[in-house]
Amino acid sequence: MQNRPTSAYIHIPFCTQICYYCDFSKVFIKNQPVDDYLKALMEEVRHYELPALKTLYIGGGTPSALSAEQLDYLLTQLEHELDFSQLEEFTIEANPGDLTADKIAVLKKSACNRISLGVQTFDNKMLKRIGRSHNESQIYETIDSLKAAGFHNISIDLIYALPGQTMDQVVDNVAKALALDIPHLSLYSLILENHTVFMNRQKRGRLHLPGEDVESEMFDYILSELEKHGFEHY
């Protein structure tokens, strides 16, 4: 078969907490049949008979919400079922605070070579305001632990134009992101989606977002500051 894929995405729909802005396919992990899901996932992987992959991305949900044993099962089975002989990049999403030492050890012995962390903001009050479960100190602890384990291809996600967010807070977030000395940053403006806490609040007039001019100023600052530090916008 021609034009067979060389990239694959695998979805882990479980979360330890549901963020107020997220409309991705996800469920709260407590009392969910996680092991059954992982076994069914492996059956689907076998069904597709994928060719040698160049990139593999495991997202969610929150893949790091899995226990160390479940994560080990997932990654070990993927190595059995998929051809990694041409693999260049294997990314897994994680949340700061979720990546315990035993989970990092599981990642280290696997083929995974890139970690994408859902930081979103460094501001502790804002983290609570958007429904995140980690705090600023856990961001640094997680990245230090990953680097100590030999992971240097680390990316973080940041969201700007959050409810009540100021330009000064964006400046602070960018400065702290740059200080991490990591090779990749993903920054997104907040987009309100249906069936989220934030959209429900917006419909009731209870969500106060930065205006369009302020959001534009935030974007221009982020782009300029990151380019100054050698990052390429794409």
Give the location of each predicted region.
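A generic fold-level signal
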Residues: 2-3, 14
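Short metal-coordination and nucleic-acid-contact micro-motifs, chiefly zinc-binding Cys/His arrays
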Residues: 8-11
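C-terminal scaffold of the Radical SAM
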Residues: 3-5, 26-47, 52-233
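Local cysteine-cluster metal-coordination motifs and their immediate loop/turn environment
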Residues: 13-26
